[in-house]
Amino acid sequence: MKKILITFFTVLFCLTSSVGWSLTKDDLVRRDDLYYKKFSDIQFTGKITGQFQGSFKNGKEDGSWIGYHKTGQLFYKWKYKDWLEDGSWVSYWMNGQLQYKGNYKNGKKEGSWVDYNKDGTIKRELTGTFKNDEKISD
């Protein structure tokens, strides 16, 4: 009987330790511009999976992010650094065509930004210095 119990608990331990808990953005709540795990007062640090995939550090979005439309089609790829937009930002229409692409640095648009129509043709292209998402100089 003792061997059976030891075997049972060993198998149970192995099974439960190999199951990982994955969180989605639905498992988080946003308060005061920070993200928390539901029913917690501790700012969330970790990765989420699902329709939106990325990392949080001390309640702030950090690192590379990928999002998908509900159809499974790629929606966006972008990056954060200390919760500010930083690096390449690309978004796609539900039909797979580019919607826009550009770069951010320290939360501000920088360089060239291109907006596309749903058929893939260029809607507008902006290059220069931006303020409040509007171009103010070359």
Give the predicted meaning of each segment:
Residues 14-138:
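Glycine/tyrosine- and acidic-biased, solvent-exposed loop/turn segments at the edges of beta-strands
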Residues 4-16:
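Sec-dependent N-terminal signal peptides
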